[in-house]
Amino acid sequence: MRVLFAGTPDVAIPTLRALVGSRHHVVAALTRPPARRSRRGHDEPSPVAATAAELGVPVLEPRSVRATDVAEELRALDLDVAVVVAYGALLPEDLLAIPRHGWINLHFSVLPAWRGAAPVQHAVWHGDEVTGATTFRITAGLDEGPVYGVLTERVRPRDTSGDLLARLADAGPRLVLDTLDAVADGTARPQAQPDDGVTLAPRLSVEQARVRWADPALAVDRQVRACTPAPGAWTTLDGARVKVGPLDPVDAPPLPAGRIAVERQRVLVGTGSAPVELGRLAPAGKGWMDAASWARGARLAGDATFGADDG
């Protein structure tokens, strides 16, 4: 089949590579336009754009998919199907009607759970033991379309959202290829999503990533792992922002929420229940460092407390 691939970040690359190596023909890659993606200060192509160019796939980088020339370009491609992996923009209905077999999305949850932009982060934050990925046909509703296939993946106890997303991104291409092969062969039987079990996963804001030290240790641990690497867990110390890496709940005497205690080369922080051990952090304007090294040079007051000025 003639396939349009739509995606933008690194997690979309395994599927793009798999499609290019498959029986199907990737005629173009639709991706978000160049943007500032690092501290270099200039716009850079998306990871998908760079990979598509490497693979010899023509790249489409419209500022808006609602522009009339985008629909014209897609019609000219004579598309059988479009595959979406984290494109990063909502598709208007006139575009959805262009490919003969519609647009098939690889979504990183087992639908109807965690519909929305941040399914992996929400799965980690809510302590899900199992999640997965789903291929479904995109419709006008938010991740509501009929399902072609599902895979499942265990959420490991120390997974960050980045860890889990990387595994799903590597497992997803097989599901996508199986789905496309079934569509091409006429054996695909998409099933409507059930009405029960629907949960929503909106994008996490920077404010939601502010560590809530007054919550129980388990909740704090899940919050930080869910926000790692994005949007990035953080707190404050003496009015300055500090990035916080994954934590480890420990068996230690309780501390006031946010209180910092240095003990035997460990940096402990109080929560609403038991303390947690801080492994890494990044003080304002500095790179990541291990917490023990930071504590040795930080000249902490005896009552130093993360988040004391949160209000």
Curated annotation (Swiss-Prot):
Keyword Iron attached: no
UniProt enzyme class: transferase
Record EC number: 2.1.2.9
Database matches in InterPro entries: Fmt, Formyl_trans_C, Formyl_transf_N, Formyl_transf_N_sf, Formyl_transferase-like_C_sf, Met-tRNA-FMT_C, Met-tRNA-FMT_N
Database matches in CDD domains: FMT_core_Met-tRNA-FMT_N, Met_tRNA_FMT_C
Keywords annotated in UniProt: Protein biosynthesis, Transferase
Coiled-coil features, chain-numbered ranges: none
Reactions performed catalytically: L-methionyl-tRNA(fMet) + (6R)-10-formyltetrahydrofolate = N-formyl-L-methionyl-tRNA(fMet) + (6S)-5,6,7,8-tetrahydrofolate + H(+)
Residues binding (6S)-5,6,7,8-tetrahydrofolate, per UniProt: 109-112
Record-linked Pfam families: Formyl_trans_C, Formyl_trans_N
A GO cellular-component term linked to this record: cytosol
MF terms (GO), sorted A to Z: methionyl-tRNA formyltransferase activity
Family: Belongs to the Fmt family.
Role according to the record: Attaches a formyl group to the free amino group of methionyl-tRNA(fMet). The formyl group appears to play a dual role in the initiator identity of N-formylmethionyl-tRNA by promoting its recognition by IF2 and preventing the misappropriation of this tRNA by the elongation apparatus.
Official protein name in the record: Methionyl-tRNA formyltransferase
Gene designation per UniProt: fmt
